[in-house]
Amino acid sequence: MESFTLSKNGYRLDTEFKNVPVAFVNGLRRILLSEIPTVVIRDVQILDNSTKMIHEMLKHRVEMLPINVRPEEAAVIRDTKIELRYLPPATPDLTRKSAVDITSDDFAIDGPRPGIILKDRDLDEPLYFMRLQPTESIHVKASLGVETKGTSQVCVATFKNHIDPELAKLDKDTYVAPAGDDDNERAMLAKVFDNYEIQRSYARDDEGRPYWFDFALESIGVTPAKDLLKQAATIFKKKIETWCENPIQREEGDWYSIETEEEGHTIGALAQILIYNQKVNFVSYRIVHPLLPKMIVRFSSKIAPEKVIEKFKTEAVALCESILKSV
């Protein structure tokens, strides 16, 4: 991991990863998107809903509100209760004169501390929730919980191949050469190259594969970006170590496989490329079926399979530890 820069009060991190396989960077991205422990709204009870929004959508919208509580704040998570109650006013016709825009500030918080629903980080304004028409009412209760799968604390987690400036210059000269001495045509082709074709001029290793990546991470505001990257690397390391403990199944003719119902593409793709680099006869991974939680890594090698897996573990863990040391 190269040096990194922080912005937006520490909630955005930009860095570069060098001499790593694309599967490793993508694995980090996948963990950041859906495997970081996150405090969420759960146990939603809809006691009254006369709006046009169906119950399922209302429940989903409540659960999507970002919570300004960290997973380690056990007391806050346990004792906080959330309620939204908006009934028609006690007027003779039980109607309002105009519609009402409900925001996150309209949720009543009963717990150890207020302000647990995040505001818009950039505008410092409450989040828009829904519009309530004059004759409509709503009453919702909920609590907090911690989820480790399928939730996210980031609004940006992405990477791209790093552009090799020397290669880009050569490619650009080649791209604009057909224009000859026509300055207008050269300028147009140069603009096209800078806006699009330059993406092909990425840094490559000796085997022509990308090895240098620009990585961007932005937190929605609960946990700083630097801490999120550290958590992702820690989780990745643990997943690697756990996967390597699975039994190796032996087949005929120096064929071996490892099956797991706990992991998928994150570990499978990384195992495939790092084992491939050991010059084995064959290696692949596959997800048995999209609806079945099973991933199989299969390889053929004259080398003892235990040594192959141990080398994979050493290299993969070293990649994670390089991040932990850098941040």
Task: State what each model feature region is.
Residues 1-327:
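Protein-protein interaction/assembly regions in multi-subunit complexes
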